[in-house]
């Protein structure tokens, strides 16, 4: 039996916050700030956004490893934060996140139309998130009331290793019955999510304006002067360089055009691993 590379995409694997819901990815960011504050440790929104895309325990561990934050913790507790301390912050983070997730549950403008267009091209819709399953249950239910239902959902605690490991993306491949990772495109607003897709052998699309990197509401994004938006796009594109996305677009609304381009490249014999 011979290997035949895929002729078209079979699935899009979409992130959630900052990709399909919660323009600006505010739900997790603000809660990190509040969770640390309950322990008397100040963390800025900008600092909290840094590791976005990782599982939430790993995100907190990464924040605690930042020297400035570690020193703030030491000033309060007389020691550097241990894994047990990270777990204590995480256990405070979780109920806050569940309580407030609905405040940032709106679908990103253009998402439903783009996803419908992908389905019309024959793609299945997988999804994964840095949220654990207990939070994803609520996120999924809220999205369903707004008209979005993915074909499969993988939470960060449903695999041995979250992003930037490829496990969540690959779990979607298995569950959706996709026969080749090169027939998948991973879409995300964070570098760990792009690395996840890259390591899974997929096409990758980074979102520059709807998520964590820009960190603005939709209204603020639309109101940005053209010159400032261009500067921000340049900054964000540089941030993504290390993870090597195949495409960079502003929001999911532009995704159908990218899928058509990937299909054309597959038809020419191109593969994601070779680019």
UniProtKB/Swiss-Prot annotation:
Family matches, as InterPro entries: HAD-like_hydrolase_sf, HAD-like_sf, HAD-SF_hydro_IA, HAD_sf, PGP-like_dom2, Phosphonoacetald_hydro
Gene3D superfamilies the UniProt entry points to: HAD superfamily/HAD-like, Putative phosphatase, domain 2
E.C. number: 3.11.1.1
Disulfide bonds: none
Keywords: Hydrolase, Magnesium, Metal-binding, Schiff base
Cofactor: how and how many bound: Binds 1 Mg(2+) ion per subunit.
CDD domains (UniProt xref): HAD_PHN
Quaternary structure annotation from Swiss-Prot or TrEMBL: Homodimer.
Function text: Involved in phosphonate degradation.
Listed HAMAP family: PhnX (MF_01375)
Family: Belongs to the HAD-like hydrolase superfamily. PhnX family.
Protein name: Phosphonoacetaldehyde hydrolase
Organism listed in the record: Pseudomonas aeruginosa (strain UCBPP-PA14)
